[in-house]
Amino acid sequence: MSLAPSVIEPAHEEDAFMDLLATSALDDPLAAARDATADMLRQRQGDHSLPQPFYNDPRVFALEMREIFEHEWLFVGMTCEIPAKGNYLTVQIGDNPIIVVRGDQGTIHAFHNVCRHRGSRLCTQAKGKVAKLVCPYHQWTYELDGRLLFAGQDMGEDFDLGAHGLKPVAVTHAGGFLFVSLADQPPAIDDFLATLDDYLAPYEMDNVKVAAESNIVEQANWKLVIENNRECYHCNGAHPELLNSLIEYDDTDDPRATPAYRDLVARQQAHWEQQQVPWALKRFGKRNRLTRTPMIEGVVSMTMDGRPASQRLMGRLPNPDMGSLRILHLPNSWNHFMGDHAVVFRVLPLGPQQTLVTTKWLVHRDAQEGVDYDPEWMRKVWDATTDQDRQLAEENQRGINSVAYQPGPYSRTYEFGVIDFVDWYSDTMLSRLDAEAPSLHIVQG
């Protein structure tokens, strides 16, 4: 049975998926799901949303957690959150608890947050500061570089401390962003990181702090959260607060861009050039992009009135009129950097229909709450926008769960960013599913 959306009746896409699972030559359910998922990806209709199982099936979710979230570089936090030796942050990536900690000479380490004794989590708080990493269960004690220092009582004469250090996780950072990858061989990212460093150099990311943080759980698949972010087709009807400052166009390459917008961009780019801040659009495939775009003329910050949220500007920026430096990192982050503050977003799947969205507002390290900025005022635009997006994603999920759902067409004019994301997702998943397929085939002797 074909899985192409143009052939399968909408009400039977899940049936087709189940048929492939049932007829797979392998007994392992995840291997069977792999074959069925790869087949759906090969036959999916371009410029359309994905078939229903990609948004609600636990087996597809398990596959994409393995092939994407346990493989890609994921944004997990900011270096300013672990400023000194012993500072740590934790993050949950699927079933995998991870700890990122600052060690000697400022070195940043990442480990599986799992004791090598009996598997208990070491650090249970989101953030903290410790002299050593100590398991709360039996007090096994680790150095900040992961070496096991103490293993309790009577482990036997042959017990080897050196063989029981914490299991490391790949970690890197640039422009104040922390990224981890659970893969043994993470994908190449150096070009993007170098550009991230260059574009954020004027913001002096060693001198920022988190002024506010929000964590909300959306009852929607993580891809719906990202899809919603990758277009502003919905903005006029959903985001009055955001449109006080944001211009919907993504860049001058946006097919909707008007001559007036291109003129504004040209004037702003001349201003940014004079201020010596990078602005040119940079793409790294469909996974990463950076671009500086103007806001509504006369607006300098994403606030309710367009005025700065912080009187202390970021880094060495000479004035607040810096537009919005937009940074996209798939699969789990989008960001806006303005002259006075920045807003960074992190997306982490919790289940097939549940996603954690974390928002952090950054200001200059020396900005004083109550003097230079009011965190509640700073948050208003994106608190409202994120909640509106939550409602949109959740209603999208409810509709997709219906037997009436079938993949719908994207607009190349308004939803080109969604097309890019879904294409990136599909290509990435398919290449990795195909790459591992031979090792799972049963060979008859």
Swiss-Prot record:
Reaction it catalyzes:
glycine betaine + NADH + O2 + H(+) = N,N-dimethylglycine + formaldehyde + NAD(+) + H2O
Disulfide linkages recorded for this protein, renumbered to the chain, are none
Thermal properties of activity per the entry? Optimum temperature is 30 degrees Celsius.
Tell me what controls its activity.
Activity is absolutely dependent on the presence of BmoB. Glycine betaine monooxygenase activity is significantly enhanced by Fe(2+) and severely inhibited by heavy-metal ions, including Co(2+), Mn(2+), Zn(2+), Cu(2+) and Ag(+). Severely inhibited by EDTA.
Ordered alphabetically, the record's keywords are: 2Fe-2S, Iron, Iron-sulfur, Metal-binding, Monooxygenase, NAD, Oxidoreductase
Activity versus pH, per record: Optimum pH is 7.5.
Q: How is the cofactor bound?
A: Binds 1 [2Fe-2S] cluster per subunit.
Which cofactors are reported in the record for this sequence? [2Fe-2S] cluster; Fe cation
Residues annotated to bind Fe cation? 234, 239
Top-level taxon of origin: Bacteria
Pfam families documented for this protein: Rieske, Ring_hydroxyl_A
- EC number(s) recorded for this UniProt protein: 1.14.13.251
Q: Which InterPro entries match?
A: Rieske_2Fe-2S (IPR017941), Rieske_2Fe-2S_sf (IPR036922), Ring_hydroxy_dOase_asu_C_dom (IPR015879), Rng_hydr_dOase-A (IPR001663)
Where do the Rieske domain residues begin and end? 73-180
Question: What is reported when this gene is inactivated?
Answer: Can use glucose or dimethylglycine as the sole carbon source, but is incapable of growth on glycine betaine as the sole source of carbon.
Residues bound to [2Fe-2S] cluster are 115, 117, 135, 138
GO MF, any single term: iron ion binding
What this chain does, per the record?
Answer: Involved in degradation of glycine betaine. Part of a Rieske-type oxygenase system that catalyzes the conversion of glycine betaine (GB) to dimethylglycine (DMG). This subunit is the terminal oxygenase component of the system. Is specific for GB, and does not show any activity on choline, L-carnitine, stachydrine, dimethylglycine or sarcosine. Activity is strictly dependent on NADH.
Q: Can you tell me which family this protein belongs to?
A: Belongs to the bacterial ring-hydroxylating dioxygenase alpha subunit family.
Provide the assembly information. Answer: Homotrimer. The system is composed of an oxygenase subunit (BmoA) and a reductase subunit (BmoB). Maximal specific activity is obtained when the ratio of BmoA to BmoB is 5:1.
> Per its record, how is this protein called by name?
Glycine betaine monooxygenase oxygenase subunit
Q: Gene encoding it?
A: bmoA
